[in-house]
Amino acid sequence: MSTENDYIVADIGLADFGRKEITIAETEMPGLMACRAEFGETKPLKGARITGSLHMTIQTAVLIETLVALGAEVRWASCNIFSTQDHAAAAIAASGVPVYAIKGESLEDYWIYTDKIFQWADGGFSNMILDDGGDATMYILLGARAEAGEDVLSDPHSEEEEILFAQIKKRLKASPGWFTKQRDAIKGVTEETTTGVNRLYQLSQKGLLPFPAINVNDSVTKSKFDNKYGCKESLVDGIRRATDVMMAGKVAVVCGYGDVGKGSAASLSGAGARVKVTEVDPICALQAAMDGYEVVLLEDVVSSADIFISTTGNKDVIRIDHMRAMKDMAIVGNIGHFDNEIQVAALRNLKWTNVKPQVDLIEFAKGNRIILLSEGRLLNLGNATGHPSFVMSASFTNQTLAQIELFTKPGQYQNQVYVLPKHLDEKVARLHLGKLGVKLTELSGEQAAYIGVTPQGPFKSDHYRY
């Protein structure tokens, strides 16, 4: 572990390796490079102090260096204990950006690192949060509520909550009043993923959101690309790296058919698996059926399928009774944000055999075993390297534009959750067309008038479903 200066990474000696991969990734991330070209001189993020909690990968390194190029000061940690790419973290730390991220870090370290990305050397405060899953935002808001006298730390419902609450109490004791001051310094948060967005909307509905938020996840150029096409490539990559299993002919069950589920089903189907889908939403279920997938109850296929993937963003999707009934050596994994989609805690009293990092064999009393990937956390990042650079460029360009929007327009946004305007969504798409050799047809003035748009766009209404 390398801990000198203002960073904690696995091995700072990996920085050169990380830098080489960052250089390659930059050629696949035209949106972020275009942001540097457009905003690099004016530096609209000058004065921004961004706390970032997002998977510390090579692609994220390109995002971080884009934010810095636009004038921001940045402190960073990963939003998942298994998703860090240690050479990426080393390269960013070596560049002078404080990073706290190690692949396979403990939950205790995870929350310590989340605290550290708010601790500036001069004692100042972060004024922006760039979040993935909402943990950094939740950390500050829970602490501030505790300082206000609310009883929010006395009843943890999981091991992770117990560890989180202990870290908040530690900071409360060390720095009384700090959480409230940090909360009040935040100008806005930009949130990357469905799970974190749901948290923000819940806060907003209860009147508990103390600063504006931009829902990056629901930008079309994020959810319809990162969630779908990213998962389409990275899910099978993770399963193969973890197990070396042949997927052709296997029966795979995808729990959920939202954008992530659609990409996951396509990923497995493309590898030759026979895919079945479970759903609670009648619209998504109908989509799955008309896409050619059998829509089933998990209970009806749990003893016959070979691979189970949860994609829902909900909890207790694959339960202990499901796993107990699975065939010997069934593969169980999750590509939703948190590990509680699978009841991993209920497996802890069984026999675990670690096969290799993030691959565990778990044996039930009757002798059947399951292969659990990444302890139920994101397997595409835990067992592989996540989505490809190109699709992450679209997501991270949205993040960059959202950070600029909130930081440069104080007072224009209320304490609510917003999405980026359509013209910026279309801008993100345009920035990625050239890399693929795409040529856009242009509307004539008469054609544009006929459908009620301008020749330059936006071309669709805000409620259009792509």
UniProtKB/Swiss-Prot annotation:
Chief localization: cytoplasm
Keywords carried by this UniProt record: Cytoplasm, Hydrolase, NAD, One-carbon metabolism
Enzyme Commission (EC) number: 3.13.2.1
InterPro entries hit by this protein: Adenosylhomocyst_ase-like_sf, Adenosylhomocysteinase-like, Ado_hCys_hydrolase_NAD-bd, NAD(P)-bd_dom_sf, S-Ado-L-homoCys_hydrolase_CS
Substrates-to-products reaction catalysed: S-adenosyl-L-homocysteine + H2O = L-homocysteine + adenosine
Any GO BP: L-homocysteine biosynthetic process
Binding site for NAD(+): 193-195, 227, 256-261, 279, 314, 335-337, 380
Pathway: Amino-acid biosynthesis; L-homocysteine biosynthesis; L-homocysteine from S-adenosyl-L-homocysteine: step 1/1
Binding-site residues for substrate, renumbered to this chain: T57, D132, E192, K222, D226
Bound cofactor: record note: Binds 1 NAD(+) per subunit.
Subcellular location: Cytoplasm
UniProt feature coiled coil, ranges: none
One example GO MF annotation: adenosylhomocysteinase activity
The protein's required cofactors: NAD(+)
A cellular component term, taken from the record's GO annotations: cytosol
Pfam family, one: AdoHcyase
Function statement: May play a key role in the regulation of the intracellular concentration of adenosylhomocysteine.
Family assignment from sequence similarity: Belongs to the adenosylhomocysteinase family.
Protein known as: Adenosylhomocysteinase
Gene that this polypeptide is encoded by: ahcY
